[in-house]
Design a protein with these regions (language model features):
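Structured beta-strand/loop patches that form or line metal/cofactor-binding pockets in enzymes
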Residues: 1-46, 50-51
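Conserved, mostly hydrophobic/aromatic
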Residues: 3, 42, 66, 103, ...
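Metal- or metallocofactor-binding catalytic centers and their adjacent structured scaffolds
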Residues: 38-114
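Flexible, glycine/charged-enriched surface loops at secondary-structure junctions
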Residues: 78, 119-122, 215-222
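Active-site mouth loops of central-metabolism enzymes
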Residues: 93, 129-144, 163-164, 192-198
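N-terminal small/glycine-rich loop or linker at the start of catalytic domains
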Residues: 114-140, 174, 179-186
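Non-catalytic positions within long, well-ordered alpha-helices that form the structural scaffold/packing
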Residues: 150-153, 209
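Catalytic core of soluble alpha/beta enzymes
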Residues: 162, 168-237
Length: 237
């Protein structure tokens, strides 16, 4: 099985429930990229990802830098393809960090279809269902987060993850207000998208423990391992 066609489309997403912007920042334009890989057997692999501020720019990286690595390859060689993209990104192309992932998903999708299995069984099934939670984008006010969490709770969704827009004092107001609004029996999580210092993360983490948040996602960038080790020593969440 060989990949013979690499297609992508970018779609400007319609407005979400609420305006999306960092505090004091520009409006966030969350475009969507759709990827389709076609093989000589006729099988197709699909994936979708968000493309941050510009779907047009992301699609150009896909076609000019990533597609040449993928075309003509066996989708079973997905690990080799991923590692090649990782090297190219560092040495040559500098494409957005979120682009290799959906290509990898499309490769997995192809191989699962060839095997005649849903992907979760192809990779080794453990359960056949998972709970769903809603996830926010950056919202301008504390009340917007409260309203969004309550909206999703009213639809029967059991959890909500906030992406507070900063600074840290604003984020802590969001955490407290959302917990008060949804009650103690609703699952809450937060993700500041790598925006904290270590001291800020410890301060916020202690608040989250008191408010019974389920997890504290990405307070630092993924490569700041020392900070994560220190944070784990300081917190129980």
């Amino acid at each position: 099985m060989i990949i013979t066609k690499f297609e992508s489309w970018w779609v400007e997403r319609g407005k979400c429930l609420f305006d999306e912007r960092r505090q004091g920042g520009a409006k966030m334009g969350w475009d969507v990229i759709v990827i389709r890989l076609t093989t000589d057997t006729g099988l197709e692999g699909h994936a979708v990802c968000m493309a941050a501020r510009s779907g047009a720019v992301s699609e150009s990286y896909l076609q000019e830098s990533i597609a040449p690595v993928v075309l003509g390859r066996d989708p079973h060689d997905r690990e080799a393809i991923f590692q090649e993209l990782w090297v190219i990104d560092r040495h040559e192309a500098f494409f957005p960090v979120f682009l290799p992932g959906p290509v990898d998903v499309a490769l997995w999708d192809l191989c699962a279809k060839e095997a005649g299995l849903p992907l979760y069984k192809y990779i080794g099934a453990y359960r056949d269902k998972l709970p769903v939670y809603a996830s926010s984008n950056f919202l301008p006010t504390v009340q917007d987060y409260v309203d969004e969490a309550l909206y999703y709770k009213s639809k029967g969704i059991k959890g909500y993850k906030a992406h507070p827009a900063g600074p840290v004092e604003f984020d802590m107001k969001v955490h407290a207000a959302v917990r008060e609004a949804v009650g103690d029996d609703f699952i809450l999580m937060t993700d500041p998208v790598g925006d904290y210092t270590l001291d800020e993360a410890i301060r916020v983490g202690r608040q989250l423990e008191k408010l019974n948040y389920k997890w504290f996602e990405e307070p630092f960038r993924d490569f700041e391992l020392y900070k994560y080790s220190e944070l784990c020593r300081a917190l129980d969440i």
